[in-house]
Regions:
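Terminal connector regions
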Residues: 623-670
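Charged, amphipathic alpha-helical linkers/stalks
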Residues: 651-652, 658-729
Length: 817
């Protein structure tokens, strides 16, 4: 089968008027598509839900400000990635699909698999990993599970969407090789192995072209190369030019923006800017999806098994937690020892991030409430600190006295809500200082401190010496408390392994000098050296390496056999406890002609072994094991050479090494090492303009803000506005943003508006504002107040009049037989 699938509902499309076709490609409401009753084409419902369904009971809004129905809050993607367990991912996907189907949700907007370029990205908790192979494999497992229940999964955000600051008005400047190898490979796996039936385009531009309008991305790569046969959905408010989006391969603009975009599509067809064949193809793809989703078998039971899903969330959390430190085997806990439990997080757990993925859970456990279910000698519990920074000296003193009298202290701490949220990037990697001050004081009176961390992304850990053991739960969902206690008491043997590197300090990170960008462009100068690819190659010492995690037992590796199509390796549990090991296969090419990381993850397997048990595992090679993208020939190629196959327990803990010869197919190597010395060493923190230009193969775009503001500039850029009123509005927005940050709770509405381009006013107001009116607003912002007001007022009445005309045409079409 070629890339272009046969339109299953062609006869329906042929019966549609052009007004119906154009209207169908934009949403009806915030979450629903339009129906065409006369042709029996129903509306379908889309919902957020990467780690739990967020279907709102009343009026819908993009950011979840209105209450949503109860759903299971599973651990976030960043947490589950640490399990390295594809079977678990599929199990969670099935549960998500069941819950979506029970709520009549047709398309689930997830999973998120953007690459963790920097630890500071505020939405990292929603993404799997810094590694594209692990991200893709875990995403594919979720997708298979979700879609097994008659619900489409919609992986997001395609592509290169790595910062929240001005995410809707940012141009990612990235070379084609890095785009392919780092930022697209995960999506490729999700499509080819997960068979995703929908995909969400990202807000940003990629090399000057909006992702939703990028034909190279949406047609040449997604559909032709990967064989994608589903629908492309915009991120909410992410449609810039709907006509260009339709031509490029985008099917559905969300949310509803009235009929403004539909009128643009019709005008483009009539003036020849858009081929009607392209319009028909997009409509056909969408109608195919709608009919498949509404005519297939779906769960009719409105009540999913809440208890079973809660227990699955517990299992998932336990398998995903990472034991980072365990001096003198202080864990599992000795039940005879007296224990003090301290920390705000023990009473009010932080189990998910903020933003569009926030779930209204069926129930939430906290450690303080369920401790009595475990055979532990609890001396006492107290908060000791307030996560909002308020100080209660009496409680602090009580915490220190309690610690002094206990044999062991369990200290629960981590990042607060304002630290990790959609629409907001972190400014540093530190845990709030009041928590660390208390930890340090406790460690002075009790050396047996067990730190229980809650954070959705990497953090700096200069305080790690204050803890004898550290158990990192990430954001572990509604059943995280019992999962944590299962590990602390030895009921479960920890088997989580880090899906991202923990650097010693933020200044060590590869994109330190380039992230986040405060200009129009974000330059990906670090190239392929993201995460461990950078630290490992440039020999930067880290706190905890990619793939790291401890167990209550020990594993040995032996008998590595390298075959033409994969490897075999034996793993033995040499300890006295049953446990699971994550066997990781890395591949490198010493003395490569084409610069590359020292090693890259190309396969993994999680194996459960009883004490003393040994098992031979097989990890296959695939089409991604040896390839690189040759920018000179525009294709995947293999460089001839002797490749190192490295098998170990982390990127820094290689147990067995072997070699394999590969005959390549390169038809000319793309780089001149003399012109790219730092890319050949991996030391990429200070890449010059000349070297970056050589990598790109063209001049570096000018990303400076200058001149008048335009419709695609972010509203926060009104700092530069010529209008005093616009600058006043900017100051008010900034003040409200800072106030919410000071209170410790992100104001999602303010954050969205702050980062939104002016065109978003038209895209996010349900048809009340047209693009003509937006141009008037921008005129006013640029100091042409009267001209702008005339456009806004005139545009308002024209928009109302034109919307009524359009609705009349649709009603007339509906009266036809």
């Amino acid at each position: 089968m070629g890339w272009k699938t046969v339109m299953k509902q062609q006869k329906l499309v042929e019966k549609m008027t052009i007004e119906e076709k154009a209207a169908l490609l934009s949403g009806k409401t915030v979450w629903q598509t339009r129906e065409i009753d006369r042709l029996s084409i129903p509306s379908i419902f889309l919902s957020d839900g990467p780690h739990g369904i967020r279907k709102q009971a009343g009026a819908g809004d993009h950011l979840g400000l209105n209450a949503s129905l109860n759903a299971t809050c599973f651990p976030t993607a960043a947490t589950i990635a640490n399990s390295w367990d594809q079977d678990l991912g599929e199990e969670i996907g099935q549960a998500l699909g069941e819950e979506a189907a029970s709520m009549d949700v047709n398309i689930l907007l997830g999973p998120g698999l953007n690459i963790k370029r920097s630890p500071l990205c505020g939405r990292n908790f929603e993404y799997f990993s810094e590694d594209p192979y692990l991200s893709g494999k875990m995403a594919a497992s979720y997708i298979r599970g979700i879609q097994s229940k008659g619900v489409y999964a919609c992986p997001k955000h395609l592509a290169v969407n790595s910062q929240e600051l001005r995410r809707m008005a940012m141009d990612a400047v990235v070379d084609e090789r890095t785009l392919r190898e780092i930022y697209l490979t995960g999506f490729e796996i999700a499509v080819k192995e997960g068979h995703a039936k929908a995909i969400m385009s990202s807000y940003n531009q990629i090399n000057g072209i909006y992702a939703n309008e990028d034909k190279h991305l949406l047609t040449d790569i997604l559909r032709k190369e990967w064989g994608f046969d589903g629908i492309v959905v915009t991120d909410w408010g992410g449609s810039n030019d709907h006509v260009k989006g339709v031509a490029a391969g985008s099917n559905l603009e969300m949310p509803s923006c009235g009929y403004d975009s539909a009128r643009e599509v019709i005008a483009a067809v009539r003036n020849g800017k858009l081929k009607e064949a392209d319009l028909d193809e997009r409509v056909g793809e969408l109608v195919d999806a709608v009919m498949e989703l509404t005519s297939g078998k779906k769960l009719s039971d409105k009540n999913f098994d809440r208890n079973a899903h809660h227990q699955l969330a517990r299992k998932a959390a336990a398998e995903s937690m990472i034991l980072l430190k365990n001096e003198k085997q202080i864990l599992p806990l000795d039940t005879k020892k007296s224990i003090a439990v301290i920390g705000d997080f023990a009473f009010s757990p932080r189990y998910q991030g903020a933003g569009s993925s926030m779930v209204n859970p069926t129930k939430v456990e906290d450690m303080s409430s369920i401790l009595q279910q475990y055979d532990l000698n609890i001396l006492g519990m107290t908060r000791g600190y307030q996560r909002n920074g308020d100080v209660d000296e009496n409680d602090r003193k009580f915490a220190l006295n309690l610690s002094m009298n206990a044999d062991i202290v369990i200290f629960c701490f981590g990042l607060d809500e304002i630290s990790e949220s959609e629409g907001l990037d972190r400014t540093h990697m530190r845990i709030p200082q009041d928590q660390i001050d208390l930890l340090q004081d406790i460690s002075k009176v009790n050396e047996n401190v067990i730190g229980i961390l809650s954070a959705g992304s990497a953090i700096e850990m200069p305080w790690h010496t204050c803890c004898k053991a550290i158990l990192h739960g990430y954001l572990n969902g509604q059943a995280g408390a019992s999962a944590t206690l299962d590990i602390l008491t030895g009921k479960v043997n920890p088997s989580g392994r880090l899906a991202e590197t923990y650097p010693i300090s933020y200044e060590q990170t590869p994109a330190f000098r380039y992230y986040p960008s405060n200009e129009k462009t974000s330059e990906y100068r670090e190239s392929v050296y993201v995460g461990y690819r950078y630290y490992d190659t440039s020999k930067v010492r880290v706190q905890y390496p990619f793939g790291f995690g401890l167990s209550y037992t020990e594993f040995t590796y032996s008998d590595l056999i390298i075959e033409e199509d994969g490897i075999k390796v034996s793993v033995t549990n040499t300890g006295d406890r049953d446990g699971a090991e994550v066997v990781q296969m890395y591949v490198g090419l010493p003395n490569a002609i084409v610069f590359r990381p020292e090693k890259e993850l190309k396969g993994f397997a999680k194996v459960y072994l009883k004490a003393g048990e040994s098992r031979q595992l097989r990890i296959p090679f695939d089409d991604k094991t040896f390839r690189y993208w040759n920018i000179k020939t525009g294709q995947w190629e293999i460089e001839t050479g002797t490749y190192q196959i490295m098998v170990g327990a982390s990127v820094a803990d290689i147990r067995l090494t072997g070699m394999t010869e590969r005959t390549g197919n390169s038809k000319g190597y793309p780089y001149n090492p003399a012109k790219m010395p730092y890319y050949y060493t991996g030391i990429v923190q200070k890449i010059s303009d000349e070297e970056f230009r050589e990598l790109l193969g063209h001049d570096i775009p000018n990303g400076r803000w200058s001149g008048n503001l335009e419709i695609n500039d972010a509203i926060c850029q009104m700092y530069y506005a010529k209008s005093r009123l616009a600058r006043l509005i900017y100051r008010c927005l900034t003040k409200m943003k800072k106030k919410s940050e000071a209170q410790g709770k992100p104001d999602l509405n303010i954050l969205f508006i702050y980062n939104m381009p002016f065109r978003g006013i038209a895209k996010m107001t349900g048809g009340a504002v047209s693009m003509e009116m937006v141009y008037g607003i921008v005129d006013a912002v640029n100091g042409h107040f009267m001209r702008g007001v005339k456009k806004v007022v005139g545009g308002y009445f024209r928009n109302r009049r034109n919307n009524k005309k359009y609705e009349k045409l649709l009603k007339e079409a509906g009266g036809k037989c």
